[in-house]
């Protein structure tokens, strides 16, 4: 029977699991890159349409721009089940944020409604490719009883970056120009991608060999591992929990 925990304890536990898991630290960096790029779409589309780049002031132009972003997102989402059968979550998500970075720097050269629609379509592709597999990572990185806390941590931590980039996108566009906003947020997204590549190893094995030195007598791990001078050594799908508080260095 899982131990009952307070809301505060569950939230804290989720954040501790999240930050102790390398692939989830990579996911956090991906979330930062996504929010940096997508803030331009969600905050500045109306401003761009109404004069930031001299486009026609029209509800139709706005609808077409947002529809382009939505179409890119939908196409990526529909393609992902097939892609994820052939590629790793890491490859797909980092390709998605890479596409966002390229799109942000391309935005510094954007002129006219057709280029805006094409760019928003590309950003939609990258946004969906980077975001959609995140639930798989959270599921893979937790026991059933810890998943509510871990999903809560994902919600809280990812929204910190939205809290930063929403006002920053608006301020940069209003204070300087859309070109500057694209460039600055593109640099922020690129930095986040670099961090993701550093903290999320391409070698992300499901099962990791590791050693326990302080298991209680009668713990099931005694039956599945081999004795060593320091304790029990064995291999199984690794998630951070009470008996596995730190990620093994061999699993990176």
Predicted regions and their residues:
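Helix-loop junctions at membrane interfaces in 12-TM secondary transporters
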Residues: 108-120
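Multi-pass alpha-helical transporter architecture, strongest
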Residues: 186-216
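Transmembrane alpha-helix termini and helix-breaking/packing motifs in multi-pass membrane transporters
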Residues: 47, 51-53, 164-183
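Flexible cytoplasmic inter-helical loops of multi-pass small-molecule transporters
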Residues: 1-16, 206, 210
């Amino acid at each position: 029977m899982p131990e009952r925990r307070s809301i505060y304890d569950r939230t804290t536990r989720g954040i501790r699991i999240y930050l102790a898991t390398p692939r989830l630290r990579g996911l956090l960096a991906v979330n930062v890159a996504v929010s940096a790029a997508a803030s331009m779409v969600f905050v500045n589309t109306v401003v761009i349409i109404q004069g930031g780049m001299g486009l026609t002031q029209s509800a139709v132009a706005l609808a077409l721009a947002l529809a382009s972003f939505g179409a890119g997102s939908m196409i990526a989402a529909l393609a992902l089940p097939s892609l994820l059968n052939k590629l790793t979550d890491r490859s797909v998500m980092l390709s998605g944020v890479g596409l966002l970075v390229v799109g942000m720097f391309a935005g510094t050269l954007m002129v006219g409604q057709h280029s805006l629609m094409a760019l928003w379509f590309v950003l939609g592709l990258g946004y969906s490719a980077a975001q959609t597999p995140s639930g798989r990572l959270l599921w893979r990185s937790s026991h059933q009883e810890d998943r509510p806390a871990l999903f809560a941590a994902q919600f809280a931590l990812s929204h910190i970056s939205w809290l930063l980039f929403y006002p920053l996108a608006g301020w940069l566009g209003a204070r300087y120009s859309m070109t500057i906003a694209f460039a600055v947020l593109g640099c922020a997204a690129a930095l986040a991608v670099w961090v993701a590549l550093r903290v999320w190893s391409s070698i992300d094995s499901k099962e990791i060999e590791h050693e326990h030195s302080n298991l209680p007598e009668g713990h099931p791990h005694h039956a599945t591992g081999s004795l060593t001078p320091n304790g029990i050594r064995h291999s199984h799908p690794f998630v951070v929990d009470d008996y596995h508080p730190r990620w093994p260095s061999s699993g990176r």
